[in-house]
Amino acid sequence: MKITWLGHAAFLLEGSMKVLIDPFLTGNPNAPVKPEEVKADYILVTHGHGDHLGDAVEIAKRNNAPIICIHELSRILSRYDVETMGMNMGGTARTGSIAVTMVPAWHSADLEDEQGNIISAGLPAGFIVSMDGVRVYHTGDTDVFLDMQLIGELHRPDVMLLPIGDYYTMGIAGAVKALELVKPKVAIPMHYNTFPLVEKDPEDFRKAVKAKGLDVEVVILKPGESYEFNK
C-alpha cells in the first residue's frame, strides 16, 4: 500500500482502491495538491471540524466517491447531493476491495454550517482501513485512551497514523503511549506544523519512541511524500 501525506491529517491510501482521509486542502498552508487534482474511490471523514471535513464534498462530487463517516454527519452531508455511507462505532463497511472499521476517538465533533451555526455532527472517530492485506489505523483527532489497547488487539494495524501536535490533540508523550498500547509496526505522525499552536519537531517524536525502546518504525513524511508498506 502506498501512503501519501497531504498535510495535517489528510492522507491518500493507494492500492487496489484509492482511499482519501480527512481532505483538508483548501486553507491548509502545507497542502501539496489542490482539491481538483485528487482522485479517490472513497473518502473517509473522521469528524465534522473544518480541518478534517475540508474539501470532502467537492472531491466526492468530482470523483463520484462515497463519503464514509459517522451516521449523524452522513445525514448532514447527504443534503449536498453526495453519496454517503453512515456508520457507527465498531461497525465495518465492506465495499469494493476495502474494509473500513470505525473506532472511537477522544475529541469533539461539532460542525459549523453555512450560516455560522454550530450543530451536532455525531461523535469523533478513527478508522481501520484494510486493503490488499495491509491494515492502517488513522486515529483521527484524539488524546491517548486505554481502549486503544483493545483496538490494537482486535485489529492489529500494520501502520498507525497519529497526531503529535498537542493543544487540540495528544502531544508527543501521549502519542508514544498510544504506540505502546496499539503496537503497530510503523507510525507516521500527523496533525502538526499546520498552524502555530501545533508546531512540533517530528524528530522529537522519533527520539521519544526510541528512548522508550518500542519496536515501531517511525516514518516522517513531508507533505506530498509517500511511504510504501508491503507485507
Curated annotation (Swiss-Prot):
What keywords tag this UniProt record?
Answer: Hydrolase
Q: Which Pfam families match?
A: Lactamase_B_3
Citing just one GO molecular function, the answer is: hydrolase activity
Keyword Cell inner membrane recorded: no
Cross-referenced NCBIfam families, in alphabetical order? Answer: PRK00685.1
Q: Which family does it belong to?
A: Belongs to the UPF0173 family.
Q: Which HAMAP family match?
A: UPF0173
Instruction: Indicate what this protein is called per its UniProt record.
Output: UPF0173 metal-dependent hydrolase AF_1265
